[in-house]
Design a protein with these regions (language model features):
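P-loop NTP-binding module
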Residues: 1-266
């Protein structure tokens, strides 16, 4: 296993950190067998990679052994954004049979947090992500880690996210507030449904709390609103904490709206 140092970890304010704790809690309500989770978005620059990274940090801080798999093989921004020193091998090296899985894994300077970086851009990203090697890799990581978070490309651009989502336990869609139309989000949702992907919920990102006072007004307020989808479930009260990441689980917990001001692009 390689060792890498992440030099640019964002300092989050209280509300932002609490929002990720809420997202972390909501995912736990999705079920104990939901361990391999992919994140996608409609378009680039909605904050998908930032949400993936900060979710992993939150999980790691809670004591969960967590690994972030950078499956954006076409245009990864992870290593550059967080100023990690260059890894020797990445996901594309492993999927193309050049190295063993352990060689592609990186132990970071954050306790409980490992990363598999994307590696060099391959000529056939979709084929690699849809192959047996990627599926088998996720099963191996499932046995080793409490959570496997997979950062995938925007689904509005390429089909890779649907390919990955179909073999994960569930998918979270990151949507930039005020930038993406309802119809566009529904189109992405339809693509995921077609491949049998379980959609765990949606993170509403980059919410302007001044223009959207709703998210700030109910900060710290507990509420529950069960929205069953044909599955058995009980109403749970979740905490409405912040104004930039909204999340809700797949019919197993209450609808929750949270927010985290100032998320980066990616």
């Amino acid at each position: 296993m390689q060792n890498v140092v992440i030099r640019a970890i964002e300092r989050l304010d209280f509300r932002t950190k609490e929002a990720y704790k809420t997202l972390r809690t909501n995912l736990s309500f999705a079920g104990k067998n939901v361990k391999v989770i992919s994140l996608t978005s409609c378009t680039p620059n909605e904050g998908k990679t930032s949400v993936s990274f900060q979710l992993c940090l939150s999980l790691a801080e809670s004591g969960k052994q967590t690994i972030l798999v950078d499956a954006d093989l076409r245009k990864s921004v992870l290593r550059g954004r967080y100023k990690a020193n260059r890894e020797k091998y990445g996901l594309s090296h492993y999927l193309s049979g050049q190295v063993e899985l352990d060689d592609a894994c990186c132990r970071t300077n954050v306790n409980n947090f490992d990363i598999i970086f994307a590696g060099p851009v391959p000529p056939n990203p979709s084929e690699l992500l849809g192959g047996d090697a990627f599926r088998n890799m996720l099963e191996v990581l499932r046995m080793k880690y409490d959570y496997v978070i997979v950062d995938t490309p925007p689904l509005g651009s390429v089909i890779d996210a649907a390919i990955v989502g179909a073999i994960c336990d569930g998918t979270v869609i990151v949507v930039e507030s005020g930038a993406i139309s309802y119809k566009f989000v529904q189109n992405v949702k339809e693509q995921l449904n077609k491949v049998g992907c379980r959609i765990l919920g949606c993170v509403l990102n980059k919410v302007n709390t001044k223009k959207n006072p709703y998210y700030g007004k109910y900060y710290g307020h507990y509420y529950g609103n069960y929205y069953g989808n044909g599955q058995d479930g009980t109403e749970e009260a979740q905490e409405d904490l912040t104004p930039d990441a909204g999340s809700k689980t797949d019919g197993t917990a209450a609808e929750t709206k949270t927010a985290v001001p100032g998320q980066n692009t990616g």
